[in-house]
Amino acid sequence: MPTPPFERFYETHRDEIYRYLVRLLGRGGAEDAFQETFLRALRGYAGLRHAENLRAWAFTIATRVALDERRRERPAADLPELAARDRRPAYAELEHLAGELPRTERAAVVLRYGYDLAYADIASALGSTEDAARQAASSGVRRLRRKGIR
């Protein structure tokens, strides 16, 4: 499958990538990360050989940019709590609940249950193995259940 023009790729994925970055970084951090995500995507887009899973590729870039941003920020204990920003109630609730998880678990839970990505795609986004992605999502869900969240 040939890759669509970058403009179409951007139009198709920008909103959900922005929401994802807001979930991970808060609104202030998401602005710069969003720009950096699509700048990196633009740089690499011409080199793509096929367009089988551009969505997962975009999430991979966004996750790596978010992790880079987090490394430059304050320690995790000082991170602001995420607020419900998405208008869809299920996503808003997931965003709120996942905000209490460690970064990797939070990303895995949001990508799996918020965006319905396959574990292989989550692994690619996190820079880990599929088993590690599955474990991170599972640990996140277990941690939420221990807090009484079903």
Which residues are covered by each model-predicted region?
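DNA-recognition helix of helix-turn-helix
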Residues: 63, 67, 126-150
